Swiss-Prot record:
The gene is N. This is Nucleoprotein. Residues 230-239 have a biased composition (Basic residues). Coiled coil: none annotated. Belongs to the alphacoronavirus nucleocapsid protein family. Homooligomer. Both monomeric and oligomeric forms interact with RNA. Interacts with protein M. Interacts with NSP3; this interaction serves to tether the genome to the newly translated replicase-transcriptase complex at a very early stage of infection. It is found in: Virion; Host endoplasmic reticulum-Golgi intermediate compartment; Host Golgi apparatus. It comes from Human coronavirus NL63. It holds the Pfam family CoV_nucleocap. GO terms for cellular component: host cell cytoplasm; host cell endoplasmic reticulum-Golgi intermediate compartment; host cell Golgi apparatus; ribonucleoprotein complex; viral nucleocapsid. Residues 140-183, 196-244 are annotated as: Disordered. One of its GO terms (molecular function) is DNA binding. The keyword Phosphoprotein applies.
Length: 377
């Protein structure tokens, strides 16, 4: 017969993941974390340039309210490649709750950075790019000081309460003595005047409160009508600017939304070189009349797909800058560098955007630019 050893509680212990070097981020969005976290969101401050690679581990959170489970915004914790709860995973190996990130030039081999010790405080993460509005740093709370703070607050409240009672009693006695003295003085003066023949027969009505006219209430100034937010517009009508940038309007750059370098993403149409790039963007009429348009039902919506191709001469002065913006978030290199890049095999695998291999333009006089635009209505 099997026996139970109550002294052995190892099976009942909850296994916690190794602590991260950094404070976690809170994902305050209805979107999945992998749709919000930029693919190059690696904290700065640890490791060399080869080790700027790792993953964000998603921590699902919930609480019970009236017997029902209520989901809370998830937190994400950063770990370098080869560390943390998923240290055995290879870079970009699929796993639930894992969002892979890396910087340009990082190597896809395990780092030697290890994990934070539990008695060390986590660092506040800092990044070389701006955090999307859906992400925020969760401040560290030292639980070891909670009891001392609670005791201090309790003592302060008790002292304040006793002091308040004592002060209140003293003020009450002072007011009572003052009122009694005033009454005695008024009675004595009145009696003296009466004995001298000054009997106040007619009392003038009190004018208290009537000598000072009340100022009419000024009407509140009407609030100035603010410019409508781009986020209130349909997605296909938004125009990103410095105030509401590309990430706010359309989300972070990824392989399905791959146009724009850091300047364009930050400033939108207010970026310095955007007017030149706009020369190679079809207008509404061209997109409508010169596209292959198709529709498809997606749940309660209709998906409208525009497939558009345009021929641009190779000597077009705006073409090099335009091509530079393609997947610029993964490989911010110039056109000349792309054209002069020689094919070679590196000894170590170096991360450099997993985009299709770039091919030279055709030998004819024009380049083909294909645009596929999908709109959910």
């Amino acid at each position: 017969m099997a026996s139970v050893n109550w002294a052995d509680d190892r099976a009942a212990r909850k296994k916690f993941p190794p602590p991260s070097f950094y404070m976690p981020l809170l994902v305050s969005s209805d979107k999945a974390p992998y749709r919000v976290i930029p693919r190059n969101l690696v904290p700065i401050g640890k490791g060399n340039k080869d080790e700027q690679i790792g993953y964000w581990n998603v921590q699902e959170r919930w609480r019970m309210r009236r017997g029902q489970r209520v989901d809370l915004p998830p937190k994400v914790h950063f770990y370098y490649l080869g560390t943390g709860p998923h240290k055995d995973l290879k870079f970009r190996q699929r796993s639930d709750g894992v969002v892979w990130v890396a910087k340009e030039g990082a190597k896809t081999v395990n780092t030697s950075l290890g994990n934070r010790k539990r008695n060390q405080k986590p660092l506040e993460p800092k990044f070389s790019i701006a955090l999307p509005p859906e992400l925020s740093v969760v401040e560290f709370e030292d639980r070891s000081n909670n009891s001392s703070r609670a005791s201090s607050r309790s003592s302060t409240r008790n002292n304040s309460r006793d002091s308040s009672r004592s002060t209140s009693r003293q003020q009450s006695r002072t007011r009572s003595d003052s009122n009694q003295s005033s009454s005695d003085l008024v009675a004595a003066v009145t009696l003296a005047l009466k004995n001298l023949g000054f009997d106040n027969q007619s009392k003038s009505p009190s004018s208290s409160g009537t000598s000072t006219p009340k100022k009419p209430n000024k009407p509140l100034s009407q609030p100035r009508a603010d410019k409508p937010s781009q986020l209130k517009k349909p997605r296909w009508k938004r125009v990103p600017t410095r105030e509401e940038n590309v990430i706010q309007c359309f989300g972070p750059r990824d392989f399905n939304h791959n146009m724009g370098d850091s300047d364009l993403v930050q400033n939108g149409v207010d970026a310095k070189g955007f007017p030149q790039l706009a020369e190679l963007i079809p207008n509404q009429a061209a997109l409508f009349f010169d596209s292959e348009v198709s529709t498809d039902e997606v749940g309660d919506n209709v998906q409208i797909t525009y497939t558009y191709k345009m021929l641009v001469a190779k000597d077009n002065k705006n073409l090099p800058k335009f091509i530079e913006q393609i997947s610029a978030f993964t490989k911010p290199s110039s056109i000349k560098e792309m054209q002069s890049q020689s094919s070679h095999v590196a000894q170590n695998t170096v991360l450099n955007a997993s985009i299709p291999e770039s091919k030279p333009l055709a030998d004819d006089d024009s380049a083909i630019i294909e645009i596929v635009n999908e709109v959910l209505h």
